[in-house]
A protein has these predicted regions:
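Bacterial N-terminal signal peptides that target proteins for export
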Residues: 1-9
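Short, solvent-exposed coil/turn linker segments
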Residues: 2, 55, 119, 163-167, ...
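Intrinsically disordered, low-complexity serine/threonine-rich segments
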Residues: 8-11, 522
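C-terminal motif of bacterial Sec signal peptides marking the signal peptidase cleavage site
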Residues: 17-20
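Acidic, low-complexity Ser/Thr/Gly/Pro-rich repeat segments typical of extracellular/periplasmic
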Residues: 24-252
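Ser/Thr/Asn(+Pro)-rich, low-complexity disordered segments
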Residues: 251-657
Length: 657
């Protein structure tokens, strides 16, 4: 009984204790909100530390382990400056009310201190409380950037390259991301011309307007440079800026306008003096270029021999002066280095010794030799055999042309070889094959009465048994022969300074059609301008071999470097008289201040890179004077074709003429 009483008492006490515990638990506070972390992007903010270099467009993400009471968030999560100025922000609660995102409504200031405060007003969904916390951050230092830049109302942001900017009125507007210090502003901005500039600041000193104080060069590339030393008024650094634009072409005629016929005569006369006045004084041959010193070129001098004929006929020199020069030229050709009758590409005009064109090309050059022979044959027909002195010159020319051993240059094969070296033999191993500028080499070889080649050498070697055929249409023009789009225009010049293409044809092509259409393809390609090079147009065209800003190259539609060579369009005048005459007027009147010099048109130009040659090359000068003459009178064509050996040679190869 007593034992039962004790047990009963224990049960009563236990019930009373449990009841008391439950009552006490119900009266305990609900608890505390647990914050997991605060992040800006991938960066976790730490209590008691200042997080630096945060972006000015940052959002703050707050993560909690508890479910929050959304109604308590506004007013409890705050972003303030260090002076307690509040930052208007958008606040979102999401992720089942366990996450808060605070995003400032405007970008924060650069290099400024801020504090993110979460106050005790924040509550959990079950009444949990939060003790409050604060995080310190500093924004990244600002960078001065260009928000907008225009030139004469054209966009000037890289990579845009504005064109046709009025060289007299340049107006560049630049808006920056921060205000500028007006002091010494002009020291940070420059145009490549180096001229003084006018500056105007506006829009709270964030916009600078630059204008020129004097005219810029026309048709030129001009750079705007903004120094990386520029800083904003707040001290923000700048990365620098460089871009360029092209000024518009001044179309005002640079020389008095004269009749076209007079202009053609002027061009011929100026070009003639390259071969006459600038010829090497010791030998009378043409220097390779205007900077080549004693180096004379055989091929270019062959063109120069034909230029002598034009000079006499046009009255630039007397016949006696021309014959005196011819006598000097022949004397040199008779005594200088020769190899099986052929000359080297380059010779020293003072001593007559070979100047290697390349280390292995130090002997005969049969193609260059053929250009000289073309000129000598043409001159031979111009001379008067009834005049004793001229008959002597004719005989000397025969001796020179008959000495060329074309048959030896076949090496017993049905093809001609281009080079031979006295110490390296056939090391160059270059066959002369078409279609290109070397047709005349096979023509003069076939006309030789002393060392001729058979027709099989032409058909198998040059024509490759028909492999030279093309037959495709480009821009609507059929191209009978050669590479796509025809290649450089010197293909239509060198062989045809003497060889008359007007009625020339064989089983492979009509050569008048070939040359006319290749010229028209070149013209059309240029004004179509698929590479958007500056300057190309219907009146500014012509791709051929010439100097260029990087050296020398054979420009063509398939090797377009942005370089226009006047000799290409000018020398095409026999094939494209309208297109060539338009180019001639443009080159002379519009570009003459840049393109016209002592010996006529300079070699080439590339306005895209601001390059204008000051060079003259014999092989570009020769086609100009000779092809203009063939257009005007057919003189050189008629002379060459009148040679009693030429037509039989052409007939042997299967040509009609």
């Amino acid at each position: 009984m007593k034992k039962y009483s004790l047990l009963s008492g224990f049960l009563v006490l236990n019930i009373l204790f449990c009841t008391a515990c439950k009552k006490k638990e119900a009266e305990t506070p609900a608890g505390t909100i647990q914050m997991a972390q605060v992040k800006i992007g991938p960066v976790v903010l730490k209590i008691g530390e200042t997080t630096k270099d945060i972006a000015v467009d940052s959002s703050f993400n707050l993560y909690f382990n508890n479910v929050l009471d959304p109604s308590s968030v506004n007013g409890s999560v705050l972003l303030k400056k260090s002076d307690n100025t509040g930052i208007p922000s958008d606040i979102f609660v999401f992720a089942d009310n366990r996450r808060i995102r605070l995003t400032p409504q405007k970008p924060l200031d650069h290099l400024a201190s801020y504090k993110l405060q979460v106050t005790s007003g924040l509550k959990g969904s079950n009444g949990e409380t939060f003790p409050g916390i604060e995080f310190l951050v500093v924004t990244v230092a600002g960078k001065l950037t260009i928000s907008n830049i225009t030139i004469n109302q054209q966009d000037f942001q890289i990579p845009i390259i504005p064109r046709n900017i009025d060289c007299k009125n340049v107006n560049i507007g630049i808006t920056f991301s921060d205000s500028l210090d007006p002091a010494n502003l002009n020291s940070f901005f420059s145009l490549s011309s180096g001229m003084p500039l006018k500056f105007v600041l506006s829009e709270n000193n964030t916009k600078v307007t630059i204008s020129n104080t004097q005219s810029l060069p026309d048709y030129s590339r001009c750079f705007l440079n903004i120094s990386k030393n520029l800083t904003s008024r707040s001290g923000f650094p700048f990365d620098g800026f460089t871009n360029y634009f092209y000024t518009a072409l001044d179309s005002t005629p640079k020389f008095p306008v004269i009749p076209d016929d007079q202009l053609l005569t002027l061009i011929q006369e100026k070009t003639f003096h390259y071969f006459y006045d600038f010829a090497h004084p010791s030998c009378g041959l043409a220097r390779e270029r205007n900077t080549s010193g004693d180096i004379v070129t055989i091929g270019g001098s062959g063109f120069g021999v034909m230029a002598l004929i034009v000079g006499i006929e046009r009255g630039f020199i007397t016949r006696d002066e021309g014959l005196t020069r011819l006598n000097k030229i022949l004397g040199f050709l008779e005594t200088c280095d020769r190899y099986h009758g052929a000359w080297a590409h380059w010779l020293n005009g003072a001593i007559g010794k070979t100047v290697p064109f390349t280390p292995n090309d130090n002997g005969a050059d049969l193609v260059e030799t053929s250009y000289m022979v073309e000129g000598l044959i043409t001159m031979r027909q111009y001379l008067d055999p009834a005049a004793l002195a001229e008959r002597s010159l004719i005989e000397r020319i025969y001796a020179l042309t008959n000495a060329v051993e074309y048959d030896w240059f076949t090496r017993g094969q049905n093809v001609l070889y281009w080079h031979w070296s006295p110490n390296l033999g056939w090391i160059m191993n270059m066959q002369v094959q078409g279609y290109n500028e070397t047709l005349i080499t096979y023509i003069v070889a076939a006309t030789s009465t002393t060392h001729p080649i058979p027709a099989s050498v032409y058909h198998q070697g040059y024509a490759k048994n028909g492999g030279i055929k093309n037959g495709s249409n480009y821009y609507g023009y059929k191209l009978p022969l050669g590479e796509p789009y025809g290649g450089p225009l010197f293909y239509t010049h060198y062989s045809y300074l003497g060889l008359d293409p007007r009625t020339l044809a064989d089983q492979y092509a009509n050569y008048w059609e070939q040359n006319v259409n290749q010229s028209l393809i070149n013209w059309t390609y240029c004004f179509t301008n698929p590479n958007s090079f500056l300057g190309y147009s219907k009146v500014c065209w012509g791709l051929t071999a010439s100097d260029n800003p990087w050296g020398y190259n054979a420009q063509s539609p398939t090797n377009d470097l942005g370089v226009i060579t006047p000799s290409a369009a000018v020398s095409a005048i026999a094939y494209t008289p309208e297109q060539s005459m338009n180019a001639i007027r443009f080159f002379y009147y519009t570009l003459g201040d840049k393109l016209w010099g002592e010996y006529g048109f300079y070699d080439a130009f590339d306005p895209s890179v601001g390059w204008w040659a000051d060079s003259y090359l014999a092989i570009d000068q020769g086609p100009i004077i000779c092809m203009i003459e063939n257009y005007r009178s057919g003189l050189l064509w008629n002379l060459f074709m009148s040679d009693p050996e030429v037509k039989p040679g052409l007939t042997k190869l299967g040509f009609t003429y």
